[in-house]
């Protein structure tokens, strides 16, 4: 699945609108990031306070961030990229766009979440998000959402727009085999709706129009709970997948030393605490969090055989849900 070939429309306009800022702040570090805008601002503020180096931030969905990178190939602007999809880092490394760097602060990051060219900023997990006032029984397992009480009341993120959602499908397939596809078929027959990106899947549950999300990215829901929303995040005991958020330095960066220092800061104890405050799991195993961490979850084997296998799963799922 080529994430860089989607959502190019509009990226060029955004780039032109912001070009004056980029020129004015030629000595600033430029960070492109998907995910919580408040976290990006907090990390930028902490880094600026520590180093005196100004940080320009472009925050959007992963698709829009990637489209902007593509549009700027002739005149690259980004120094550091933080994506919500591990796939994007793998693809950019294959293209030769990344500057290898191993931060000394990455020693406490598990090996599964770092390479020579990129490292997790933080980690989210996928679960069931349930509206506690929906009048439905609390689900404990993925299969519970196929019960009659949930008929027509479940949403799921579109796996063609959410790499983490696709990871969950692959993880369930790896763990359950054909039983996973039987589960997906029952969910479809029970009226589960593919609702676009992660936020669009969650919104009708927050509004009470739907009862639950199958495969919701957790940190957004935890933030909503803090804001008073009547929802609950449930991680099935049978297992789930996690979504590490890769951070990388672009080879085209004109501020490589500052970019390395920014990565170091994000992976410092102070930076990782900011990640935890945004309801993500810190990448470092020695920094705590205020939500379930890796050790609290049973993880499904989410590895695939590469882009061809991912495309095959995506196509099969799309075909299943396109048929009446």
Model-derived features with residue positions:
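Bacterial N-terminal signal peptides that target proteins for export
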Residues: 1-11
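Early extracytoplasmic/lumenal segment of secretory-pathway proteins
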Residues: 27-91
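Extracytoplasmic ligand-binding site segments that recognize negatively charged/polar headgroups
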Residues: 34, 38-40, 76-209
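A ligand-binding cleft/hinge motif common to bilobed small-molecule-binding domains
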Residues: 87-91, 211-230
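Periplasmic-binding protein-like
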Residues: 111, 124, 184-188, 194-195, ...
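A bilobed periplasmic-binding-protein/Venus flytrap-type ligand-binding module shared by bacterial periplasmic
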Residues: 127-134, 173, 243-255, 274
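An extracytoplasmic/periplasmic, membrane-proximal ligand-sensing/linker region
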Residues: 178-182, 283-324
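Mature extracytoplasmic/periplasmic domains
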Residues: 250-305
């Amino acid at each position: 699945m080529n994430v860089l070939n989607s959502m190019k429309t509009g990226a060029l306009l955004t780039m032109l609108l912001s070009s004056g800022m980029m020129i004015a702040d030629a000595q600033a570090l430029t960070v492109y990031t998907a995910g919580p805008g408040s976290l990006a601002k907090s990390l930028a503020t902490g880094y600026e306070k520590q180093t005196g180096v100004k940080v320009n931030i472009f925050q959007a969905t992963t698709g829009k961030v990637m489209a902007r990178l593509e549009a700027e190939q002739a005149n690259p602007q980004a120094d550091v990229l933080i994506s919500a999809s591990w796939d994007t880092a793998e693809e950019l490394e294959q293209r030769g766009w990344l500057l290898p760097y191993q931060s000394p602060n990455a020693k406490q990051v598990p090996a599964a979440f770092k390479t020579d060219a990129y490292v997790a900023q933080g980690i989210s997990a996928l679960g069931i998000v349930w509206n506690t006032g929906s009048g439905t029984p609390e689900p404990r397992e993925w299969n519970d959402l196929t019960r009659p009480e949930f008929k027509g009341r479940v949403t799921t993120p579109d796996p063609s727009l959410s790499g983490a959602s696709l990871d969950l499908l692959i993880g369930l397939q790896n763990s359950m085999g054909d039983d996973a596809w039987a589960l997906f078929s029952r969910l479809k027959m029970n009226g589960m709706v593919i609702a676009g990106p992660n936020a669009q899947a969650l919104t009708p549950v927050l509004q009470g129009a739907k009862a639950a999300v199958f495969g919701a990215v957790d940190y957004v829901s935890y933030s909503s709970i803090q804001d008073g929303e009547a929802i609950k995040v449930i991680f099935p005991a049978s297992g789930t997948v996690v979504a590490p958020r890769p951070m990388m330095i672009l080879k085209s960066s004109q501020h490589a030393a500052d970019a390395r220092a920014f990565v170091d800061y994000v992976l410092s104890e102070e930076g990782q605490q900011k990640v935890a405050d945004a309801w993500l799991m810190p990448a470092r195993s020695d920094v705590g969090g205020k939500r379930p961490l890796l050790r609290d979850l049973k993880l499904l084997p989410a590895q695939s055989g590469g882009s061809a296998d991912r495309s095959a799963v995506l196509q099969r799922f799309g075909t299943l849900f396109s048929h009446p």
